[in-house]
């Protein structure tokens, strides 16, 4: 009798995706983040579902309902802490996953890469609307400041902002619709993830060398299932440590005060994973310019495949490109730091320099490095 896993219509899909999938024999730990992101998504959906059972999306009771979850619901504090810190882990894995894609040339699988960029934008949108829900000071003012950016759009800007708000300011209508969006978006993300995997399995995984791995493949199970299990343990360790020992470490103290439209916090800033984008937004003195730079900082990922000039796919054997890649990584860390600082010198000029360097590296220096490396590898005799 043929194995059910190879004949049953549903089991066959699972089998071809996670069990008998031919995988390159040399993929490193950098390839673990895809499965870790899947686990993060599952954790966020499950914890979010249980939080939604006790949360109320009304301006009068939202803040109290979160306090109620933490105080009165069985293990509510744990569910909330896992959800809040799970978002940080999600973004940590996302940034490393994107970085891996840039370093090893995975962006040359254009469909997979483009769906991935759309996923990144969708996850960022989900995190933003989710941050508004506890209805603390930073939730309220963060929502006000970021939605207000749309008013920079010529002609329709103001009407668009009021349409999103559902009134003339961030209020009950805004909170209710943000809750609805925060509930539905993870399921849209799940659908996009399936499409992402569908495109990936059309081509098979890339590998650190960037060379076609078809001559040397191994089955996904047991080799990479056990490797992913180790990655999962190493992900859960910091997540549980954060959630159980210092759950508020990455949060903002201002969010422990209920939202007050009459009192603006001294420094409005988002969660750490948005600080790089916030720094880019603030680095341009013009409102519309800042919004365009903010959009460009993420959408620039879409044109990275078009800027690939090197004859080799991966940066593994390209030292000049490697150096520029790590400068880019340091630059993003600098932007993250600047995003959390007040708008004063020397932070303003550092932020502006980091912004220019960010686009210079991606759009000019890295493509030039690829051409230079091609030239250096050509035989000169």
From Swiss-Prot:
Descriptive protein name: Cytochrome b
Transmembrane segments: 33-53, 77-98, 113-133, 178-198, 226-246, 288-308, 320-340, 347-367
Function recorded in the entry: Component of the ubiquinol-cytochrome c reductase complex (complex III or cytochrome b-c1 complex) that is part of the mitochondrial respiratory chain. The b-c1 complex mediates electron transfer from ubiquinol to cytochrome c. Contributes to the generation of a proton gradient across the mitochondrial membrane that is then used for ATP synthesis.
Residues binding heme b b562, per UniProt: 83, 182
InterPro entries for the chain: Cyt_b/b6_C (IPR005798), Cyt_b/b6_C_sf (IPR036150), Cyt_b/b6_N (IPR005797), Cytb/b6-like_sf (IPR027387), Cytochrome_b (IPR030689), Cytochrome_b_C_euk/bac (IPR048260), Cytochrome_b_N_euk/bac (IPR048259), Di-haem_cyt_TM (IPR016174)
Names of required cofactors: heme b
Membrane topology: Multi-pass membrane protein
Record-linked Pfam families: Cytochrom_B_C, Cytochrome_B
Residues at which a ubiquinone binds: 201
Binding site for heme b b566: 97, 196
Cofactor binding, note field: Binds 2 heme b groups non-covalently.
Subunit structure, as described in the record: The cytochrome bc1 complex contains 11 subunits: 3 respiratory subunits (MT-CYB, CYC1 and UQCRFS1), 2 core proteins (UQCRC1 and UQCRC2) and 6 low-molecular weight proteins (UQCRH/QCR6, UQCRB/QCR7, UQCRQ/QCR8, UQCR10/QCR9, UQCR11/QCR10 and a cleavage product of UQCRFS1). This cytochrome bc1 complex then forms a dimer.
Gene Ontology terms for molecular function: metal ion binding; ubiquinol-cytochrome-c reductase activity
Keyword tags: Electron transport, Heme, Iron, Membrane, Metal-binding, Mitochondrion, Mitochondrion inner membrane, Respiratory chain, Transmembrane, Transmembrane helix, Transport, Ubiquinone
Similarity-based family: Belongs to the cytochrome b family.
GO process annotations (BP): mitochondrial electron transport, ubiquinol to cytochrome c
Compartments where located: Mitochondrion inner membrane
Assigned GO CC terms: mitochondrial inner membrane; respiratory chain complex III
Note: Heme 1 (or BL or b562) is low-potential and absorbs at about 562 nm, and heme 2 (or BH or b566) is high-potential and absorbs at about 566 nm.
């Amino acid at each position: 009798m043929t194995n059910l896993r190879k004949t049953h219509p549903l089991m066959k899909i699972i089998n071809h995706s996670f069990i008998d999938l031919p995988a390159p024999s040399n993929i490193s730990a950098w390839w673990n983040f895809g499965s870790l992101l899947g686990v993060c998504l599952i954790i966020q959906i499950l914890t979010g579902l249980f939080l939604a059972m006790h949360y109320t999306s009304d301006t009068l009771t939202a803040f109290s309902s979160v306090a109620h979850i933490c105080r009165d619901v069985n293990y509510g504090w744990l569910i909330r802490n896992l959800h809040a810190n799970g978002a940080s882990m999600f973004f940590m894995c996302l940034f490393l996953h994107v970085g891996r894609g840039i370093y090893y040339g995975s962006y040359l699988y254009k469909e997979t890469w483009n769906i991935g960029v759309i996923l990144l934008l969708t996850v960022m949108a989900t995190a933003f609307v989710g941050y508004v829900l506890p209805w603390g000071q930073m939730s309220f003012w963060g929502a006000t400041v970021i939605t207000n950016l749309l008013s920079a759009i010529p002609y329709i800007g103001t009407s668009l902002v009021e349409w999103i708000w559902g009134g003339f300011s961030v209020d009950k209508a805004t909170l209710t619709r943000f809750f609805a969006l925060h509930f539905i978006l993870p399921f849209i993300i799940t659908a996009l993830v399936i499409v992402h995997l569908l495109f990936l399995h059309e081509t098979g995984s890339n590998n650190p060398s960037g060379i076609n791995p078809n001559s040397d493949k191994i089955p996904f199970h047991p080799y990479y299932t056990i490797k992913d299990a180790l990655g999962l343990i190493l992900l859960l360790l910091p997540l549980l440590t954060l959630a159980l020992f210092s759950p508020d470490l990455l949060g903002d103290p201002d969010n422990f005060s209920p939202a007050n439209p009459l009192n603006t916090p001294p420094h409005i800033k988002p969660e750490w994973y948005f600080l790089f984008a916030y720094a880019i937004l603030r680095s341009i003195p013009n409102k519309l310019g800042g919004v365009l730079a903010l959009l460009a900082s993420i959408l620039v990922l879409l044109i990275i495949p078009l800027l690939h000039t090197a004859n080799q796919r991966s940066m593994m054997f390209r030292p000049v490109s490697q150096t520029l890649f790590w400068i880019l990584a340091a630059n993003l860390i600098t932007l993250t730091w600047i995003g959390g600082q007040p708008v004063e010198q020397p932070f303003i000029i550092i932020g502006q320099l980091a912004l220019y360097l960010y686009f210079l590296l991606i759009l000019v220096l890295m493509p030039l490095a690829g051409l230079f490396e091609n030239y250096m590898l050509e035989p000169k005799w």
